[in-house]
């Protein structure tokens, strides 16, 4: 991908070239977007850029490995997160859904753009995965290829690292494209690439953790928000179309904010200039994003046309818009895994008393907060001095995000009217971070160039600059990168994974090939936990299984899947009779889903004659009882 803003001739986007002002905004009557600094360098990438980019990628890699303790092949082959028996952390359970998707996709069952069924889930049928839209099919498909290449757990680890590397690299290139100096672009890119947001969402929300397209949005927003807009069919127009289409292929939350701020910026410019071509260009960007969004939904929509709607598959209650709305104070709350025990303790204390919580990922980091406060200071100062045209565009963008997605904001009003898709407004904290970091790079680069005396600073000056850069990077790594797992925590994951793998192997050795296993407690899929059992915990044996079939995993809401819920209303003896009638060879029990650890159920099954020795996991939470009498 070439980000080179070559200056041979002015692009058709700009017909004249008035000088920019330092304050930002528009030069009065100019028709030229005003940069917060001089124009982009004559040659990009330069040797300094390549050295900085290579250093950036190495730094991000080492920081990521430090955060997860992945320093050898054995640790790379382990998941960085895995539910521990008896732990009802719903977010950590989501990683099992990720692993399930990658395994099924790697086996060829979940192909992009096609209807999706999984033969080994949803027994006695094939699991239907068509009613819940998968809006990130291309990233998921790439992840599945990584899982097939490196193994299920190692593949997702590689994907997580690539997400951080892409975020850092793209931000660096965008910052340099936006006239940022190499050093400031490096610092901001490191902060974005190691954002607490990405660490906290990976690996259980990998589609959310892929933040790398967001810096590209900043280019589009500036183009549409500044004169003369985007000239149709220019090089910039094609770049914007490509960015819009890329956004539509990724997480729908990011597609949403790209379209919102693109439309808002274009409408404001149209009100000032009445330039219909510029407005149409902005609408073309939104159309490109919409086209990709439609492509991602074709399988779901065509399945709906063929088999009717399933309103019960995807349920979004209004309460989550309140709970997971964007909250300004959460931008300042450190993560629970902060390297400072003092700050981590403060976060724990806050979460213990706060009535409304976020996804633990809104923290902007020290550098991000400094940039946010700087932007707020400049914007408020300009307003107080009645210099409204000097208020940075970025301040208005942040203001819109807060107005739209804060708890009780415009998004909540839409939710009250029935549109509850974007329930986690706190996820837009990463967009605020990207906006403020890039603004600080542009503004800081302007000041740096304005204060620079001569082109060849002396050794003392270079030493001061180098020390400042190193100090900033050390603060970022210390502040944003989570503390590494302890030996005890890693040993717990190893013990749980080994227990599940061995348990599944014993089931496959004891049951006929292709046998069906009925899972208790009865749970609906997706997003429906049971008391004591997180929503995707029943996927644990499937991750290590080769030929068994499991009752869990077909999407709820259709009559075909209702039989399990009806079964739960019968007596145990009647239920077992129905289970055997449908061809199941064993009953799998997660003991955590029963207040008495399912001991009465196991005792009753033995009394019914199913007295073959049960298969019990090493951790003691799983048991499998074959349904054949000795």
Located regions from the model:
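Start-transfer (signal-anchor) and selected internal transmembrane alpha helices
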Residues: 1-78, 280-288, 377-395, 459-470
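Membrane-interface junctions at the ends of membrane-embedded or membrane-associated helices
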Residues: 5-6, 35-47, 177-180, 222-238, ...
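Membrane-interface coil-to-helix junctions
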Residues: 61-167, 195-211, 324-325, 329-359, ...
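Membrane-interface helix-loop junctions at the exits of transmembrane helices
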Residues: 65-69, 108-110, 184-204, 292-305, ...
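Membrane-helix boundary/interfacial segments in multi-pass membrane proteins
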Residues: 81-87, 201-208, 312-316, 345-366, ...
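Membrane-embedded helix bundles of polyisoprenyl
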Residues: 159-178, 182-271, 285-289, 293-296, ...
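Membrane-interface helix-loop-helix junctions at transmembrane boundaries of multi-pass membrane enzymes
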Residues: 272-283, 349-363, 372-403, 453-460
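Extracytoplasmic
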Residues: 471-630
């Amino acid at each position: 991908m070439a980000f080179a803003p070559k200056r041979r001739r002015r692009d058709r986007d700009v017909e004249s070239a008035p000088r920019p002002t330092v304050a930002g905004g528009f030069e009065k009557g100019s028709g030229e977007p005003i940069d917060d600094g001089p124009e982009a360098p004559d040659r990009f990438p330069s040797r300094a850029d390549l050295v900085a980019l290579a250093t950036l990628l190495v730094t991000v890699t080492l920081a990521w490995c430090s955060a997860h303790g992945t320093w050898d092949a054995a640790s790379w082959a382990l998941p960085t997160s895995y539910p521990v028996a008896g732990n009802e952390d719903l977010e950590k359970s989501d990683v099992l859904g990720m692993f399930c998707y990658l395994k099924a996709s790697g086996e060829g069952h979940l192909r992009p753009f096609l209807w999706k069924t999984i033969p080994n889930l949803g027994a006695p049928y094939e699991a239907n995965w068509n009613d819940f839209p998968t809006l990130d099919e291309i990233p998921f498909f790439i992840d599945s290829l990584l899982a097939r290449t490196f193994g299920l757990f190692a593949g997702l680890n590689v994907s997580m690292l690539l997400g951080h590397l892409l975020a850092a690299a793209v931000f660096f290139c965008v910052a340099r494209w936006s006239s940022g100096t190499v050093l400031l672009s490096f610092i901001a890119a490191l902060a974005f690439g190691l954002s607490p947001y990405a660490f906290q969402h990976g690996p259980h929300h990998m589609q959310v953790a892929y933040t790398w397209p967001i810096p590209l949005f900043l280019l589009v927003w500036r183009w549409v928000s500044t004169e003369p807009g985007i000239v149709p069919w220019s090089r910039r127009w094609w770049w914007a179309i490509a960015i819009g289409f890329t956004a539509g292929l990724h997480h729908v939350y990011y597609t949403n904010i790209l379209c919102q701020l693109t439309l808002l910026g274009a409408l404001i410019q149209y009100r000032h200039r009445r330039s219909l071509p510029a407005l149409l260009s902005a609408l073309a960007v939104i159309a490109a994003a919409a086209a990709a969004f439609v492509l991602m939904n074709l399988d779901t929509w065509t399945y709906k046309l063929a088999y009717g709607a399933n309103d019960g598959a995807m349920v979004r209650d209004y309460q989550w818009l309140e709970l997971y709305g964007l909250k300004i104070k959460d931008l300042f709350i450190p993560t629970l895994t902060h390297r400072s025990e003092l700050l981590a303790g403060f976060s724990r204390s806050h979460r213990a008393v706060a009535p409304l919580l976020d996804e633990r990922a809104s923290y902007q980091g020290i550098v991000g907060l400094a940039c946010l406060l700087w932007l707020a200071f400049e914007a408020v100062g300009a307003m107080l001095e009645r210099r409204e045209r000097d208020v940075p565009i970025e301040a208005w963008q942040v203001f819109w995000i807060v107005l739209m997605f804060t708890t009780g904001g415009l998004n909540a009003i839409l939710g009250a009217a029935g549109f509850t898709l974007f329930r986690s407004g706190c996820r837009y904290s990463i967009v605020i971070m990207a906006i403020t970091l890039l603004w600080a790079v542009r503004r800081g680069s302007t000041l740096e160039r304005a204060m620079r005396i001569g082109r060849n600073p002396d050794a003392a000056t270079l030493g001061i600059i180098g020390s400042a850069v190193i100090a900033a990077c050390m603060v970022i790594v210390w502040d944003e990168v989570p503390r590494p797992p302890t030996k005890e925590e890693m040993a717990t994951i190893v013990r749980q994974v080994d227990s599940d793998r061995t348990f599944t192997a014993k089931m496959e050795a004891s049951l006929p090939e292709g046998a069906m296993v009925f899972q208790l407690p009865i749970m609906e899929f997706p997003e429906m936990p049971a008391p004591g059992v997180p929503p995707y915990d029943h996927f644990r044996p499937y991750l290590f299984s080769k030929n068994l079939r499991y009752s869990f995993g077909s999407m709820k809401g259709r009559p075909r899947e209702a039989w399990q819920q009806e079964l739960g209303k019968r007596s145990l003896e009647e239920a077992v009779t129905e289970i055997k009638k449908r061809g199941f060879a064993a009953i799998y029990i997660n003991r955590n889903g029963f207040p008495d650890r399912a001991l009465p159920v196991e005792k009753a099954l033995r009394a019914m004659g199913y007295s073959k020795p049960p298969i019990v996991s090493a951790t003691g939470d799983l048991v499998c009882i074959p349904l054949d009498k000795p």
